[in-house]
Design a protein with these regions (language model features):
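Structured interface patches
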Residues: 1-166
Length: 166
Protein backbone atom coordinates (compact mmCIF):
# COMPACT_ATOMS: atom_id res chain seq x y z
CA UNK A 1 0.00 0.00 0.00
CA UNK A 2 1.38 3.37 -1.00
CA UNK A 3 0.74 6.76 0.58
CA UNK A 4 0.96 9.70 -1.83
CA UNK A 5 2.94 12.57 -0.26
CA UNK A 6 3.41 14.72 -3.38
CA UNK A 7 1.39 17.60 -1.82
CA UNK A 8 3.77 17.65 1.14
CA UNK A 9 6.88 17.54 -1.04
CA UNK A 10 5.56 20.42 -3.17
CA UNK A 11 4.78 22.29 0.09
CA UNK A 12 1.08 22.59 -0.78
CA UNK A 13 0.47 21.18 2.70
CA UNK A 14 2.81 21.00 5.69
CA UNK A 15 1.10 18.06 7.37
CA UNK A 16 -1.44 15.40 6.54
CA UNK A 17 -3.48 13.10 8.79
CA UNK A 18 -3.24 9.42 7.97
CA UNK A 19 -5.79 6.70 8.74
CA UNK A 20 -4.81 3.51 6.95
CA UNK A 21 -5.97 -0.08 7.11
CA UNK A 22 -3.79 -2.64 5.33
CA UNK A 23 -6.47 -4.82 3.72
CA UNK A 24 -4.44 -6.15 0.76
CA UNK A 25 -1.94 -8.39 2.52
CA UNK A 26 -2.98 -11.26 4.75
CA UNK A 27 0.53 -12.42 5.67
CA UNK A 28 4.21 -11.58 5.36
CA UNK A 29 7.55 -13.32 5.83
CA UNK A 30 9.93 -11.84 8.41
CA UNK A 31 13.01 -13.87 7.46
CA UNK A 32 12.31 -16.67 9.96
CA UNK A 33 8.63 -17.47 9.64
CA UNK A 34 5.46 -16.47 7.89
CA UNK A 35 3.31 -14.16 10.00
CA UNK A 36 -0.45 -14.16 9.44
CA UNK A 37 -2.60 -11.09 10.06
CA UNK A 38 -5.70 -12.12 12.02
CA UNK A 39 -6.99 -8.56 11.74
CA UNK A 40 -5.95 -5.95 9.17
CA UNK A 41 -3.25 -3.70 10.67
CA UNK A 42 -4.21 -0.06 11.18
CA UNK A 43 -1.94 2.97 11.19
CA UNK A 44 -3.26 6.30 12.46
CA UNK A 45 -1.03 9.34 12.59
CA UNK A 46 0.37 12.42 10.90
CA UNK A 47 2.86 12.90 8.09
CA UNK A 48 4.64 16.26 8.20
CA UNK A 49 7.48 17.90 6.29
CA UNK A 50 10.36 20.00 7.53
CA UNK A 51 12.94 21.12 4.95
CA UNK A 52 13.25 17.99 2.76
CA UNK A 53 12.52 15.42 5.50
CA UNK A 54 9.09 13.81 5.79
CA UNK A 55 8.22 12.43 9.22
CA UNK A 56 5.52 9.84 9.89
CA UNK A 57 4.40 9.70 13.52
CA UNK A 58 1.53 7.48 14.51
CA UNK A 59 0.13 4.46 16.27
CA UNK A 60 0.17 0.99 14.74
CA UNK A 61 -2.24 -1.71 15.87
CA UNK A 62 -2.33 -5.29 14.57
CA UNK A 63 -3.51 -8.75 15.57
CA UNK A 64 -1.18 -11.48 14.32
CA UNK A 65 -0.70 -15.23 14.67
CA UNK A 66 2.60 -16.61 15.98
CA UNK A 67 3.95 -20.09 16.75
CA UNK A 68 4.96 -20.89 20.32
CA UNK A 69 8.72 -21.46 20.72
CA UNK A 70 8.15 -24.40 23.09
CA UNK A 71 5.08 -26.30 21.88
CA UNK A 72 4.71 -24.95 18.30
CA UNK A 73 1.03 -24.19 18.99
CA UNK A 74 -0.37 -21.19 17.06
CA UNK A 75 -1.49 -18.28 19.25
CA UNK A 76 -2.86 -14.76 18.89
CA UNK A 77 -0.52 -11.82 19.60
CA UNK A 78 -1.57 -8.17 19.72
CA UNK A 79 0.82 -5.44 18.58
CA UNK A 80 0.32 -1.83 19.71
CA UNK A 81 3.26 0.42 19.01
CA UNK A 82 4.27 3.97 18.22
CA UNK A 83 5.64 4.55 14.72
CA UNK A 84 8.31 7.18 14.07
CA UNK A 85 9.75 7.02 10.55
CA UNK A 86 11.59 9.59 8.44
CA UNK A 87 11.77 9.82 4.64
CA UNK A 88 13.43 12.02 2.04
CA UNK A 89 13.56 12.29 -1.73
CA UNK A 90 17.11 13.69 -1.54
CA UNK A 91 19.51 10.95 -2.73
CA UNK A 92 22.47 12.81 -1.15
CA UNK A 93 21.09 12.27 2.36
CA UNK A 94 23.54 10.01 4.20
CA UNK A 95 21.53 9.38 7.38
CA UNK A 96 20.85 5.65 7.76
CA UNK A 97 17.69 6.32 9.78
CA UNK A 98 16.04 8.18 6.89
CA UNK A 99 14.51 6.10 4.09
CA UNK A 100 14.69 7.26 0.50
CA UNK A 101 11.35 7.95 -1.22
CA UNK A 102 10.55 6.69 -4.68
CA UNK A 103 8.01 8.52 -6.86
CA UNK A 104 6.78 10.74 -4.00
CA UNK A 105 5.04 7.84 -2.23
CA UNK A 106 5.66 6.11 1.09
CA UNK A 107 5.48 2.31 1.06
CA UNK A 108 3.25 1.92 4.12
CA UNK A 109 3.32 -1.89 3.89
CA UNK A 110 7.07 -1.90 4.52
CA UNK A 111 6.70 0.53 7.43
CA UNK A 112 4.00 -1.62 9.05
CA UNK A 113 5.91 -4.90 8.57
CA UNK A 114 9.18 -3.46 9.92
CA UNK A 115 7.49 -2.06 13.02
CA UNK A 116 5.67 -5.34 13.69
CA UNK A 117 8.96 -7.26 13.39
CA UNK A 118 10.61 -4.90 15.89
CA UNK A 119 7.77 -5.53 18.37
CA UNK A 120 7.90 -9.34 18.17
CA UNK A 121 9.03 -11.00 21.39
CA UNK A 122 12.34 -12.86 21.26
CA UNK A 123 10.82 -15.87 23.03
CA UNK A 124 7.34 -16.42 21.63
CA UNK A 125 5.24 -18.30 24.18
CA UNK A 126 1.56 -19.21 23.93
CA UNK A 127 1.39 -18.78 27.71
CA UNK A 128 3.97 -17.98 30.36
CA UNK A 129 3.96 -21.50 31.86
CA UNK A 130 4.00 -23.42 28.56
CA UNK A 131 5.38 -26.93 29.16
CA UNK A 132 6.45 -27.51 25.56
CA UNK A 133 6.82 -30.85 23.80
CA UNK A 134 8.11 -34.17 25.14
CA UNK A 135 11.64 -34.60 23.83
CA UNK A 136 11.10 -38.30 23.16
CA UNK A 137 7.60 -38.73 21.74
CA UNK A 138 6.73 -35.13 20.77
CA UNK A 139 3.48 -34.96 22.79
CA UNK A 140 2.28 -31.47 23.70
CA UNK A 141 2.69 -31.49 27.49
CA UNK A 142 0.16 -28.65 27.89
CA UNK A 143 -2.68 -30.98 26.88
CA UNK A 144 -1.56 -34.45 27.94
CA UNK A 145 1.08 -36.33 29.85
CA UNK A 146 3.25 -38.62 27.85
CA UNK A 147 4.06 -42.16 28.93
CA UNK A 148 7.75 -41.92 28.19
CA UNK A 149 10.11 -43.08 30.88
CA UNK A 150 12.68 -40.61 32.01
CA UNK A 151 16.20 -41.58 31.11
CA UNK A 152 18.44 -41.55 34.16
CA UNK A 153 22.14 -41.08 33.68
CA UNK A 154 23.67 -44.24 35.22
CA UNK A 155 26.49 -42.15 36.69
CA UNK A 156 23.95 -40.16 38.73
CA UNK A 157 21.55 -43.01 39.63
CA UNK A 158 23.16 -43.44 43.06
CA UNK A 159 22.31 -39.81 43.92
CA UNK A 160 18.61 -40.56 43.46
CA UNK A 161 18.82 -43.28 46.11
CA UNK A 162 20.92 -41.05 48.37
CA UNK A 163 18.33 -38.25 48.50
CA UNK A 164 15.33 -40.57 48.90
CA UNK A 165 16.74 -42.13 52.10
CA UNK A 166 17.17 -38.81 53.91
Amino acid sequence: MNLDVSDLIKKVELSKEVHLKLEDDKRFFNGEEEILYLEAPTLDGVVSISEDILTLNGKLSAEIELSCSRCLQKFKYHVDTEVHESFTNNPQCEDDEIMLLEDEVIDVTEVIENNIIIELPIKRLCKENCKGLCQQCGANLNFSKCKCEKDIDPRLAKLKDFFSTQ
